[in-house]
């Protein structure tokens, strides 16, 4: 298995496809996700990836497995101490190969190098494998930190 990670802002079309698959998967689990994505200005995010995920404060990575786009992950600045992990997604046919772990390790390393003290994330209870993975890396549950309208959202933090 040949795995490589590339900076995703230059791979807009591939990122757009992965983000679309990710949001479709979420909406299949809970239709109210659509409203949440609108609140996040999702369409603008896709048009201007650099604004949210650009260097020096953010990151967006595209993971390839055997030369095929397999997944993605983003990191965005909240403030000088806090950043947020976003859009972790591994395509179904690539799951079970520890690729999500590979991406999380990359983002944690990058967050430390940038100088952040904590990584935050929000997730949903119908993603138990993701929650388990986050906990494996040391994320723990916290109080709400954003305006996510999903009543069931779970908020997590990793101390760097």
Predicted region positions:
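A short helix-loop-beta-strand connector motif used in the catalytic cores of GNAT acetyltransferases and
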Residues: 45-62
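Conserved beta-strand in the GNAT
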Residues: 62, 68-76, 84
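Conserved acetyl-CoA-binding loop-helix of GNAT-fold acetyltransferases
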Residues: 90, 96-109, 132-136
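Active-site acidic-Proline motif in GNAT/NAT acetyltransferases
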Residues: 77, 91-97, 125-126
